[in-house]
Amino acid sequence: MTAPVQWRTFFHQCLIHRIDASEFRNLSKLLFQKCPIAESALLDALLQTRSESRIKWDPLLPLYIDCLCRMGRVRTSTVLTSLLKYSSIHDKPQLPTSEGKDGSKCYTLMTDIRVIQDAMLSVSTGSTPKTNAEAIAIFFAIIDWIHAVASWHNSHFDPGQHSSGMMSSPDVVSLFESLGILLAALSGTGKGLEVLSADSHEGLKVKLGQALSAYLPLCVEVSLPLRNRLDGLQKEFNLYGERAPKSLDVPMMENMNVNALQFEASVMDGPVINSRAGLYVFINAMLVGRPLVDDSMLINYLANRYGGHYEALIEEILTAAFDVLSNGMYRNESSRTMFVFRSFLVNKLPAFFAAMLASTMVSIPMEMCISHALSRLDPNTFPSFSQMFEMQGNTVLSDVRQEFLFACASHKLIPESSIERLLGENPMQTLPVGYNKDELVSQINANPERAEQLINEIESMEGNAGAIIGAITEVMHNLCNQKETMTLKNICNSLSRRPQALDVVLIFRNPKQVLQPLCALLDSWHWDEDQGEYQPVYDEFGSILLLVLAFKYRFDLRPADLGISSNDSFVLRLLERGTCSQKLDALDEKQNKNLGSWIAALFIAEGISEETMSACSPQEFYLLVATLFSQSLEACETGKLEFDTLKGGFEYLLEPFLLPSLIFALTWLGDHIWETELDPSIPLKALQSLVNPSSISGEAREIHRTVLNITARTLEEQLKDVRTRHPSRTDIKPILDSLEPCLSFQLVGSSHRSELESWTTHSGGGLLGGIRSTFQSLVLWSTNPEVSMAPPPYTHRQLIAGVRMLGASRVLPPLIEELKLQTEAGNGPLALDLAATLICAPMAETFSVEQNSHQPVDPNKEALPRCGILTLRDVLALQHENVPKISEKDPLRAEVLVRLYRRVNALLAPPSQVPNLDVNNIIQNMQLGGVGVGVGAGQMELDAAGAADHGVGPDDAENIHRMIDNAAAAAALDSSGTGLDTSIDDVLNAADMAVGNPEFLDLDMEGMF
C-alpha cells in the first residue's frame, strides 16, 4: 500500500470514527514515523477523502488541517494552494439540460471559508509567516484564490437579475470577504511589509495589483471598511497591476510608506477599559432626538465592546440606561424626552435581553446582574417607596425600578419572587399580563377595534410595547398588501394623534419598516371614477398620508428613511412640490379642469359634490392644494372674491376627509405671508381662521391638532419675522398664541436656544471649550465607576450642535488634544473609550448609511443611502492618513490618533457574513470533546509511545483500522481525556458566539495592524 493510499485510509477512518483533534495529532505522529509523505501529497490525500464523502460541511476537516499546520507538517501557503485545487469555486453554472450530471461533485465552500479563516488567525497572531519566502508563497496563493472567486462571479453574473454573480451565494460572499481580510492581515505583518517594500519582488506586486483591481470593485457591495483598507494598501505600495516606472522618487515614497507602517506597528495598545461614561454617552445619543435604535447595529456594537462577557454587557447597559434617566431628571429634560428614556429602559431592554439570551447557549444570572446595576445607582434619584415620603425633592422616577423589574419578570428574565429582594421592600404593583405578538395579530384580525385598544397601551410602562408594535406593524403590512384601507385608516388615525407612541415605535422599528408599505400604497392608489362614494376614499387616503407626514415631520425624515425609492413616487413629488403653487399656464388640461371644479365647489356651489371628487383622485387633489390656495387668495386680494366667501370655502378643508391637505395649504400660506411685500391682512385673517377655527367637529379636532403639530414650528418662525417687519400689527400674536402648544412636536436632537447660548459663551473657549469641559467631567466620573453617585450633566445635543454648526473637522481636534492630555495624566484607556464612543455614537444624518452596512439595500431596487455631512469618523480617517507627518512633530499625538483609529474601527467592525449555517448544531458541536476548535501547545506534545505497540506497518491497512477503533473506544470510555485546550475556545467564544457564528471566526481586521 503506497503512502498516499495509507494516508487516505487513515483520514477516511478518522472522519468515520469522529476522532478529535488531539487524538488525530497523536495518531498521525505515529503514521508519520512509519509512512513519511510530502506535504502536497498529504493534503491531496486529505482533500480527496473529503471529495469522496461528498459531505457539504464537516467541521473535522478544518481541524485536521489546522492540526497539521501546528505540527509543522504543512505550510499555510501549501494549504491554500491545495485547497483551491479541490475547491468547488471552479464549478461553472449548470444549464437546465445538464441537471444532475455533476451530482458527484463535492461542495467545498464552507470548508474553504473555515480553513482560510484559520489562516487569518494564524497570520494575525504572528504564527506565520516566519520567512519572506513563505510570505511570498501565501501572497501568490491569495492571488490565485481572488482570481478564482472573480471568475466564479463573472460566470454566474446575469445583468437581468437583481441578485446574481457573487451576491447570489452567501457562501461565496463570505469566502470573498475572508480572502480580503487574510490579504489585509498578511500585508500588515513584518514579513509581509518586507516583501511589499522590497524592489526585488516587482513581479509579485504586479500580480497582486491585478488581483486587487479585480477584487476592489466587487468589495463595495460586501464591506466598505475592508475595501477602504485594501484601497489604502493599493495606494501605499502602488499595486495597480503595472510595473512601476523607474524614478528617483519611488524609493523615497516606498521608504515613507514603510516608515508610516512601521510607526503604526510600533504603537502598542494599552488595556481596553469599558468606561461607565461610554454607554452613558451612547444611549444618550440614541435617544436624545429621533430614536436611533437598530437591534442588529446595537448587538454588533455591544458584541465588539464586550465580546462574550454577557454579564458585564447586561450590567453596564442597565446602569447606563438608569444613569441617562437620572441625568435627564437633574437637567430638567422635557417630559417627552424623559418618556423616551423611560420607555427604552422599561419596554426595550427587557425584550432586548430576552431575545439576546434566547439566541445564545450561555446561562446568565440575570438577578445578580440586575442587583449589581441597581447597587450603582444614585439612591436620591431612584428612591424606594418608603423613602419617597421622607424626600422633599423630585420623586418622578420613584416607580422606575419597579416598572423595570416587573417588565423583566414578564419576559421571564427573573422570577416574580425575586422582585421583592431586588427592591428591598414589598412592590406596590402586580405582574402585568405579558403579550405575545402572534396572539395579538390574531386578536386584531378577529376584532379590528382591538388595534386601537393596543395602541393606547404603547405608552404604558409594562414591557409590552415591543409585542404591540410588532403586531400593529405586521397587521398594517397585511392591510397594505390586501388594500383593506378602511381598517388601516383607523389604525393610522390612532397612531398619528399619539406623538409619543410614534417615539416608541422607532425604539422597536426603523421608519422604513413602518412607512415603506404605506408610501407604496399611496403611490399605487387605485382610483375608479365609477366606484360610488368618494368621500370615504378621500378620508382613508388622507388618514394614511397624515401618518406618513407625522413621522416625516416629527423626526425630520428624508425620502430614503420613508422607503421611497422611485423618482416617480407620488409621496416624493408631494413632499418636494406639494407646498409650491403653479401658474395656470403650467397646468395641463386635466389639472385646469380639476382646479376649476374645486374652486366652484368651495366658493360657488353649496358644497363639495361627489362629481367633483369623482373627477379628481386624492393624489391629483393634494398636488393642487397650494395652487388652489394661491388662486383663491389672489382673487380675494384683488377684490374678485369676498373674504367671508373665501373663509367659508376654506372651512370645507376642516372636514376630516380633507383636513390633512391643510398641511400643504398652511405651509404655502406661511410662505406667502413671509414673502409678500403687500399688506398681509387678508392672508393673516385666512391663517387665523384655519389655525383657530370658530367651530370644528370632535373627530376633526384630533386631526387638526396633528396638522398644527406638523406646521407650527415653520409658521412661528415666519410670523415672528413678519412681526419684526410690522411691529405695530396686533393680528399676529393671537395666531402665535394658538400655535404655541404645538411647537414642541419635532424630535430631532436640536438644541434649545438657552442651551446654545450657554455653550457658545463658555469661558473656556466657546462651544468647543464646552465640549472639552464635558469630556473632562465624564472621564473624572468614570474613574470611580462603582460609586453610587449621580452622573455628570450631559446631553448629546452639545456634540450634535458642534458638528452641525462648526463641522466635524473643527470638533475632532480639541477632542484629540483632550485625549492626549488625559493620556499624559494617566487616564488614557478611560479617555480613549470615551472619545471612541463619541465618534461611534449614532447621528440622524448618518444613521441610514450605518444601517446599510448591516442590512444592505438592493442597489437595483433602491438608491444607496448617502451621508450629507462630514462625520467625526471621516475626519478621524483623514487625520489618520497624516500620522507619518504628525509623528515627526508630535509623536504622542500620533500615537493617540493611531489608538483612537483602531478603537473606533474595532467598535464598529461589521459582523462577518456567514449565512446558511445551523448555528444550534454548530454550537452543540463546539461543546463536544470530539469537535474542538483548537488544541493548546502543551497538549499537542502527547506521548505517542503507548500507542506504538499497535505497529502500523506501511502496508497494513488493518493496523490503521485497529488503531482508529482503539482510539475511538478510548475516547468513548474517558470523555475527560479529549485533550482540548479551552484557551482557544475562549478566544473564539469571545469573538464569535456573541454574534451567533461560533464556527466561523470573525476577526477584528483593525487589530491585525
Curated annotation (Swiss-Prot):
Molecular function GO labels: transcription coregulator activity
Compartment annotation: Nucleus
Record's keyword annotation contains Nucleus: yes
Keywords noted in UniProt: Activator, Nucleus, Transcription, Transcription regulation
Superkingdom field: Eukaryota
One term under GO cellular component: mediator complex
Transmembrane segments: none
Record-level GO BP terms: regulation of transcription by RNA polymerase II
Assigned protein family: Belongs to the Mediator complex subunit 5 family.
Function (record text): Component of the Mediator complex, a coactivator involved in the regulated transcription of nearly all RNA polymerase II-dependent genes. Mediator functions as a bridge to convey information from gene-specific regulatory proteins to the basal RNA polymerase II transcription machinery. Mediator is recruited to promoters by direct interactions with regulatory proteins and serves as a scaffold for the assembly of a functional preinitiation complex with RNA polymerase II and the general transcription factors.
Subunit record text: Component of the Mediator complex.
Record's protein name: Mediator of RNA polymerase II transcription subunit 5
